[in-house]
A protein has these predicted regions:
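Rossmann-fold cofactor-recognition segment
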Residues: 52-69
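C-terminal helical subdomain
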Residues: 201, 205-251
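Conserved glycine-rich Rossmann-like NAD(P)H-binding loop of the short-chain dehydrogenase/reductase
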Residues: 33-52
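Hydrophobic positions on the long internal alpha-helix
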Residues: 123, 127-131, 135, 174-175
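A glycine-rich helix->loop->beta "capping" turn
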Residues: 75-90, 94
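Catalytic loop of short-chain dehydrogenase/reductase
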Residues: 92-119, 137-185
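N-terminal Rossmann NAD(P)H-binding glycine-rich loop of SDR-like oxidoreductase domains
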Residues: 20-34
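Conserved active-site helix of classical SDR/Rossmann-fold NAD(P)-dependent CH-OH oxidoreductases
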Residues: 30, 125, 169-180, 223-227
Length: 251
């Protein structure tokens, strides 16, 4: 993707990247900064890892804390009246020895379930609550949250990973419902979830051994794939889960 490849948005596009300090979020921020149509990028995360990236403004945001989300949107609305593109690039699968994907129901933990759902489902939904009203009605706008193929109920043939699978399935349903309400209020707006593929980030690092090299994307390659999908979304694509190659994944 070069500086002229993001063609379906307005000529002065304002963007918010939630989770901009992560591998995919950082790559998306850097790639979007190269797009001629992008005017402002609001880089939202707990810490600023995009220092020096053109067009970016750092906005502190903790996706697990609703007052932090409210504070972030207030800072954004002080600088712009619209958001043409909102990408939620947050998510968690594991954290230390105590939080690992479950191989058996015997490994299920209330604390871990709550933590996974807080980050993977509730956080992105609250982002939508406060950010969707800024999407313009006179041109295309997109809300996209990173999901995963393993969140597809139809695609689940091997089980396991209870919390992660379920949290992503719940995210897909949340965005589906959001898309229905959004289409009534803003017919030019699209709300989707995206499967980025297996990306060489901290999230996938422990599980990369079985992934063929050609199927393991760098964050930069993943960002190019995702922006291409987003750019090509028609309004009737709203409410679906899309893979990195533009194919619809059944819920």
């Amino acid at each position: 993707m070069n500086s002229r490849d993001l063609r379906s948005f307005s000529s002065e596009c304002d963007v918010a990247i939630i989770g901009s300090s992560g591998g995919i979020g950082k790559a998306l921020t850097e790639l979007l900064s190269q797009q001629e149509c992008v005017r402002n990028i609001f880089s939202c995360s707990r810490t600023d890892h995009n220092l020096g990236v053109d067009k970016t403004s750092f906005i502190p945001l903790n996706i697990t804390d609703e007052p932090s989300i409210i504070s972030a949107i207030n800072k954004i609305t002080a600088k712009t009246t619209k958001l043409d593109l909102v990408i939620v690039a947050t998510g968690t699968l594991h954290e230390g020895e105590s939080l690992q994907p479950e191989k058996s129901w015997r490994s299920l933990s209330e604390d871990n379930l709550l933590k996974i759902f807080q980050i993977n489902t509730i956080g992105p939904t609250l982002i939508a609550k406060y950010f969707l009203d800024l999407m313009p009605k006179d041109c295309k706008s997109v809300f996209a949250a990173l999901s995963a193929r393993v969140g597809s109920i139809e695609d689940n043939s091997i089980g396991g990973w209870y919390a992660y699978r379920s949290s992503k399935a719940a995210l897909n349903m949340m965005v589906k419902s959001l898309s229905i309400e959004l289409s009534r209020k803003n017919p030019n707006a699209v709300a989707v979830t995206l499967h980025p593929g297996t990306v060489d980030t901290k999230l996938s690092k422990p599980f990369q051994g079985s992934v063929p090299r050609d199927n393991l994307f760098s964050p930069q390659t993943s960002a190019k794939h995702l922006l291409k999908v987003i750019d090509e979304l028609p309004t009737d694509a709203t409410g679906h889960l899309f893979a990195w190659d533009g194919q619809i994944i059944p819920f």
